[in-house]
């Protein structure tokens, strides 16, 4: 399953997040796959796409970062999957 993660850096400060990432890596458990991310120009927020079969892996990953960021999780699908899913209802 694909998830869009909205990651808001605590106090709008990305430095602690990037410092930990530099020193420890992504800290993702086995089975959670990072696909891509985009960061706002003011470094206040990051939008990531992650993939995993077990939502518990995503929760485990977020727990490792919750002291530095707040998370919103939105289950998403690719546009191709959306076309296939809605086609029978058109």
Regions found by a protein language model. Give the residues of each.
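A short local loop/turn or secondary-structure capping micro-motif enriched for an aromatic residue
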Residues: 13-14, 67-69
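Short, electropositive alpha-helical surface patch
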Residues: 58-65
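Short S/T/G/P-rich N-terminal loop/turn motif that feeds into the first structured element of a domain
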Residues: 1-35, 39-45, 53-57, 77-90
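Small, basic N-terminal interaction modules of short regulatory proteins
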Residues: 49
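Conserved short beta-strand edge segments in small beta-sheet-based binding/regulatory domains
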Residues: 68-79
């Amino acid at each position: 399953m694909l998830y869009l993660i909205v990651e808001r850096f605590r106090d709008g400060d990305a430095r602690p997040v990037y410092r930990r990432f530099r020193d420890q890596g992504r800290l993702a458990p086995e089975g959670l796959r990072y696909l891509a991310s985009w960061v706002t120009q003011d470094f206040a927020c990051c939008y990531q796409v992650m993939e995993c079969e077990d939502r518990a892996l995503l929760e485990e990953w977020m727990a490792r970062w919750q002291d530095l960021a707040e998370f919103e999780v939105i289950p998403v699908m690719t546009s191709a999957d959306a076309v296939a899913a809605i086609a029978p209802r058109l």
